[in-house]
Swiss-Prot record:
Topological domain ranges for the Cytoplasmic compartment: 1-58
Location(s), subcellular: Golgi apparatus membrane
Gene designation per UniProt: OFUT20
UniProt enzyme class: transferase
Glycosylated residues in this chain: N111, N124, N371, N503
One BP term from GO: fucose metabolic process
Source species taxonomy: Eukaryota, Viridiplantae, Streptophyta, Embryophyta, Tracheophyta
Chain positions covered by the region annotation Disordered: 110-130, 525-555
CDD domains tied to this protein: O-FucT_plant
Pathway: Glycan metabolism
Name of the molecule in the record: O-fucosyltransferase 20
Tissues in which the UniProt entry reports expression: Highly expressed in embryogenic microspore and in vegetative tissues.
Amino acid sequence: MALPKNGGNSSSTKKKVSYISVPSQIINSLSSSSLQSLLVSPKKSSRCTNRFSYRNPRIWFLTLFLVSLFGMLKLGLNVDPISLPFSRYPCSTGSFDEHHAVSHLAFASKNDTQSSSSSEHRKNETLPTEGDFWKQPDGLGFKPCLGFSRQYRKDSNSILKNRWKYLLVVVAGGMNQQRNQIVDAVIMARILGASLVVPVLQVNVIWGDESEFADIFDLEHFKNVLADDVHIVSSLPSTHVMTRPAEEKRTPLHASPQWIRAHYLKRINRERVLLLRGLDSRLSNDLPSDLQKLRCKVASQALRFSPRILELGNKLASRMLSEGQYLSLHLRMEKDVWVRTGSLPGLTPEYDEIVNSERQRHPELLTGRSNMTYNERKLAGLCPLTALEVTRLLKALEAPKDARIYWAGGEPLGGKEALEPLTKEFPHLYNKHDLALPGELEPFAKKASVMAAIDYIVCEKSDVFIPSHGGNMGHALQGQRAYAGHKKYITPNKRHMLPYFMNASLPESEFNRIVKDFHRESLGQPELRTGRGGKDVTKHPVSECMCSDRRQQQQ
């Protein structure tokens, strides 16, 4: 299926030219020989014929008509065909919003796409910089390489035979936050030499999604991929059902394997069942090489979405891909995001007051650094980009105006009004509700985690991905796109950009140059995770989980 094109927007030119235009239907109706006869002077005729023509008034009228037509054609043919003010759809109003309201998503025919390919090719030739936006970074030949050490494989034999101690975990937060905790749960089970019971997904107080592990992820695939690393069971065996687990809620941030063994190994050996809660960011980012590889294996290979979610997500991605390249944005503009980040949407004073009131009623929702003002947070790069700021960023990065854009995320505070700056400059903007056929999303209407998984799939398959505000989904996709060959991932440099966003006197051309320069090294190129800088290996898989023969040859 093909996405709709906004035929009402003609290409802009650097200079406005006054001209008399001739409808393309007239020009096309003339054969090449007819045009040639009009443009080439006729041969001299005989004197007898001239006398006859001189005395015949009909010849005078015919000559006058041909001269007039010749003048009109000459003026028309001198005009750049790209600048002719004719829409590809003669009856189109050019209004995206009206067209979008009539039918969620209309799809152009294949023939229509083919008929315009030559004109679009010429347009691309006049705007060569547009191709740079879609250009992929050099992955330096890095590919996944998860070769575990001999000692790791030897230890696996004894760990997998152990069926008498079990680790239970409860993971909280949104889908991507839960995903990170599941990865760490597998690592902790390996460290403790315990079998892992399939993690329990805690119902989130904001989204209220009661989905279980198997509703979101492919459970059998999860077990099979990790069969050589950790023994995974769906539930406690009958011999342990009546056992009261030792519960722990106070695991410190960034705990090392040594700390976990020192504090939990005796307890799980004694009680046989250990229950852990609140695992978010509890496991250290700096682990032994084999455990880092296991982290990558869980995140990039074992945690595959359930078949039902994969099928729908792939369908929506195929609809975006049906006409070629597309960009995906993760927009964080929901009310709870503005509240939690201590930020303001900047739409109207009324919307700012809504956010401030909600934050005063629920101060516990504010995530960290509560002593900072909104302006301090904004300048520190701790606030999500607004739709206007995303638009200016895309223009500075030379995104084509006709780029097809998929935006992921929940309903923005302010609805369509919040997205207006983006839709005005980039009208081909879609989300999952626009792409889905009637009834396709209905089974998941109240499943926020499933909706997030669908967004994840469509964003993962895009040619370019840009998050408006970090977050767990952005981090997960950064690692996944790197693992898939370093597909383009643009990290907005908010802290450096924002002073220029606020400088109203800065010419747009200078603003664009500065912003583009800020992002030359933030396009998804391989980033070595050297030393112990605390970077998450699932976000930066080079070089523990990826290796390159080409890089070794260059060295």
